[in-house]
Amino acid sequence: MDALMVFDDMLDIPMSMQNNMIADDLLEQAAATASIAPIDIPMTPLQPEMEEEPEVEPEPVSQPEVVQVIEEPPTSTLVANERSEDFFEAAALLETVMEYVNSNDFTLKQLLAFNAAKKPKKSRKRKADSDAAPKQKKEKVEERYCVDSYEITEEIKGEIASAYEGLGALTPLRCAELIKESHELNGKIGGLDTIKDYVTLFSGRVCLYNTPANDVLTSYRKTYTNRYLERNKPTYNKDKTILCVRCATCGRKFKGEDDGEGCVKPNLTHATTTECGKRTICVMCSGIYAQLKTIPDLRAANRCLCCGVDKNKKASNAALFKVKKEKKEKKEKKEKKPKKAVEEEPKQYLTPEFVNDDEDSCDNDLSCLKNNTDLLATAMAELM
């Protein structure tokens, strides 16, 4: 019985492997371990046995499922699956993303943005629509205001890092990391994209969006200086002892000194004034002003960020304005004066009043002139 049990246990292996030679070896090993003579059992091919099993059909419903699971690969069920379209779309998307990432050095932030932008939309299309030729979509061109001719150099990175190091907002190491990340995202320096990233990273208040590079300073004045016109007035703390003033750009409070005329004289250790002297700004904003002016390919670098006047042409601009004002005043005075009605004298023409009565004088007589022409004509006719 032991030998038969061993044989039954070992018989499953050669049936699954479908090999008669291996079954004979296993049968001899089982008989040797049981110390009995090998039993001569006629070995028939295993494939007919597999064919005879379905004829019994003890469970006609469950048996085909077992055979289907064993013989058919699991990938064949995905073809009939309703979600197979989404699966293949996701696989195609992954391939495009990986190709795009391998061709370009992308950061994690940009990769996530690209993945979110290229996420496939779930839409059920008919077969007729899928068979039709795909329509060509117009490519949307993103407006970028960066200067392509100006490339990044290590000197520029060092200058920007040192400039922001002087502000005291960030450490040099963190500043260099942010600058490197910004360069990787934009690829260029000198345009609006780079300025926007730097200013938003380090100040947190000043944001320059949707403006060409040559109009950055103008938009800065319009958007942020006019917003804080009233913040330059002197204010006191609760104890009425410390005089404070707000930055005209970001609104930060800092100490100041009363100049005796109702205005604040800023302490240079905490704040400074713009080129025109009309606005008081803090050290942080003054560093941003200086950085904006040092960026190349940026027009109006000599203009005041507060009022927009060119500091190199203040005198000439004032003189020109004065001349224009004087001309305008003279013109207005002339227009205000009442015009006198001038009687126009009639022009003198040859009229019968000026004709002399003397028949001998033919200076002003038209009839005499006509007679002379008649005489000349007759004389010419006689000569002919």
Curated annotation (Swiss-Prot):
This is Uncharacterized protein ORF122. It comes from Ostreid herpesvirus 1 (isolate France) (OsHV-1). Residues 327-358 are annotated as: Disordered. It comes from the Viruses. Residues 327-339 have a biased composition (Basic residues).
